[in-house]
């Protein structure tokens, strides 16, 4: 008698419903983000009375709930007001004017040829689709810094901002980024027209991470299928990665799959540690292609120190690198690496030196070393 290789998959495993651990999952409730939810909702509320929404700039470290919070509010708003249409675009994938305009058209069910149309033609197609559908769009540009690096980004945002003025369509824009100074990259004219309200997302505390993970795990796994220490370890690992809840949730998903593949009855700490080895911190993967040689050298030096004062780090850098930079430029690079959630910086008082800054890695040293190989 033939037995299917998938028969064992039908037997009860560890997962009750692993979708609760997927990156795109939006919970019914978002703990510890109540104030940000209220701010975003309040900014979009004018749409309910056919008014113009407040544009938003949302920033904070990776895994602090920026994306899921924005999508949560949009989901609630779409359910409450059928005319509202949320359009989410990840600019890490779509990072040029043409790519974003194509995605906007597609979101309205109006696919355009991938080649052959100029940007202005695609823009006109988008405006036409908005009029036909009679919707009020909220355009969410996640990883907005990836888009703004492109020279056509300012023109794209200017086009979107003028839709209300030229076509009487109330369109809102939400920019999301890890980097505080993202808006400073924009053309002055566009930044002024955008007039975005800034909403900051801070890192989750270890205790908050535990509560978030407990809730996800309760829905994702069978009650007796996960060892009690797993959640604490996942939260501790996320805390090491600057409170990145996404890393912890991805680790639980990967660990559960490892456990099932091994035929284990329970998800254990051993499975979780194996998962950690496979998952590279997202902040590093996203940032590395955009770091210059100076920033990479700073990270190489930091991997040799648990912590170091800023003056000592500058001296170490100057002794290694032929490319001289001023202390101010060096400080700017440290600040950028901190904004990217790779370094942690805190004000400190050192004997003799007086006030200074203490620099530490905000991501696992091993992951940084691995990603810097070959540079």
Task: Please report, for each region that a protein language model flagged, where it lies by residue.
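A short, basic N-terminal segment
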Residues: 1-53
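Conserved catalytic segments around the Walker B and adjacent sensor/switch elements
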Residues: 55-57, 79-93, 197
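Terminal-proximal interaction/regulatory segments of ATP-powered molecular machines
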Residues: 305-375
């Amino acid at each position: 008698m033939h037995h299917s290789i998938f028969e064992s998959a039908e037997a009860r495993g560890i997962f009750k419903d692993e979708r609760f651990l997927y990156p795109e999952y939006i919970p019914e409730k978002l703990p510890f983000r109540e104030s940000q939810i209220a701010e975003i909702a309040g900014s979009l509320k004018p749409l309910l009375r056919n008014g113009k929404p407040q544009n938003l700039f949302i920033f904070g470290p990776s895994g602090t709930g920026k994306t899921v919070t924005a999508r949560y509010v949009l989901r609630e708003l779409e359910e409450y007001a059928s005319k509202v249409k949320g359009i989410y675009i990840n600019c890490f994938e779509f990072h040029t004017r043409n790519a974003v305009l194509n995605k906007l058209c597609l979101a309205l069910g109006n696919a355009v040829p991938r080649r052959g149309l100029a940007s202005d033609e695609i823009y006109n197609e988008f405006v036409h689709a908005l009029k036909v559908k009679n919707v009020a769009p909220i355009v969410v540009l996640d990883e907005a810094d990836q888009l703004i690096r492109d020279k056509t980004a300012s023109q794209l945002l200017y086009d979107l901002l003028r839709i209300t003025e030229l076509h009487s369509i109330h369109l809102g824009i939400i920019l999301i980024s890890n980097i505080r100074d993202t808006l400073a990259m924009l053309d002055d004219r566009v930044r002024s027209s955008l007039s975005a309200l800034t909403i900051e997302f801070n890192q989750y505390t270890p205790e908050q991470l535990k509560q978030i993970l407990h809730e996800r795990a309760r829905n994702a796994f069978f009650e007796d299928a996960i060892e009690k220490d797993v959640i604490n370890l996942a939260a501790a690992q996320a805390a090491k990665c600057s409170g990145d809840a996404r890393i912890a949730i991805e680790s639980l998903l990967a660990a559960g799959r490892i456990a099932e593949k091994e035929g284990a009855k329970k998800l254990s700490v051993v499975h979780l540690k194996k998962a950690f080895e496979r998952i590279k911190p997202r902040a590093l993967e996203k940032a590395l292609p955009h770091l210059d040689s100076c920033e990479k050298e700073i990270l190489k030096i930091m991997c040799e120190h648990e912590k170091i004062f800023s003056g000592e780090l500058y001296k170490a850098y100057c002794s290694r690198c032929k490319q001289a930079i001023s202390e101010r430029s060096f400080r700017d690079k440290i600040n950028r690496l901190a904004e990217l959630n790779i370094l942690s910086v805190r004000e400190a008082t050192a004997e003799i030196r007086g006030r200074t800054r203490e620099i530490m890695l905000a991501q696992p040293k091993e992951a940084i070393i691995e990603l810097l190989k070959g540079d």
